[in-house]
């Protein structure tokens, strides 16, 4: 009964003020529902976040990392990974069905949802129309832990096929550091030059790391 009564606090706060009013601890407690023997759910949620550093660290962790957290078994781990996958698919559907005008923040959040946690480098492209509305997005190339082979010709071929006018490039660094490499800068220059011949504009190239990102446009490189 103690765990259930303590869970009412986040629930009541959510119903009164909205889900965004909850702290990370309260939101996690709402999901966990119950604590463990001798530990209420809010305490358990607090300890989990402290152990993993943040919600990001928690949702991108592997099962082996949960072995030191008492009260978290396979079922809860599977549920947590399910939440992360739901978020990724939500952004996927939103981008595909709403065809929104992209803000820098929405673009970053979408790309983080798609590329965070990947064990290999993935290179993807968001294709936009002349009004910078999303037409579609595609994972065009996949590579190894620290390298992905990118072919500008294939990017342009796909853009022409769907009548795109602008592109946003993106790839991840599984190592966690989002700082672009020399190779990242060189391939970006190659893609931009190739696109110019076809009247295609590259708006940005965003590199996704672990909890961080680098935007070529924000740094003035595009």
From Swiss-Prot:
Record-level GO BP terms: proteolysis
Record's keyword terms, sorted: Hydrolase, Metal-binding, Metalloprotease, Protease, Zinc
Keyword field contains ATP-binding: no
Residue ranges of every copy of the MPN domain listed in the record: 100-222
Gene3D superfamilies: Cytidine Deaminase, domain 2
Pfam families: RadC, UPF0758_N
CDD domains: MPN_DUF2466 (cd08071)
Gene Ontology molecular functions: metal ion binding; metallopeptidase activity
InterPro entries: MPN (IPR037518), RadC_JAB (IPR025657), RuvA_2-like (IPR010994), UPF0758 (IPR001405), UPF0758_CS (IPR020891), UPF0758_N (IPR046778), UPF0758_YicR (IPR022820)
Family indicated by similarity: Belongs to the UPF0758 family. YicR subfamily.
Listed PANTHER family: DNA REPAIR PROTEIN RADC (PTHR30471), UPF0758 PROTEIN YEES-RELATED (PTHR30471:SF3)
Record's protein name: UPF0758 protein YicR
Protein species of origin: Escherichia coli (strain 55989 / EAEC)
Name of the coding gene: yicR
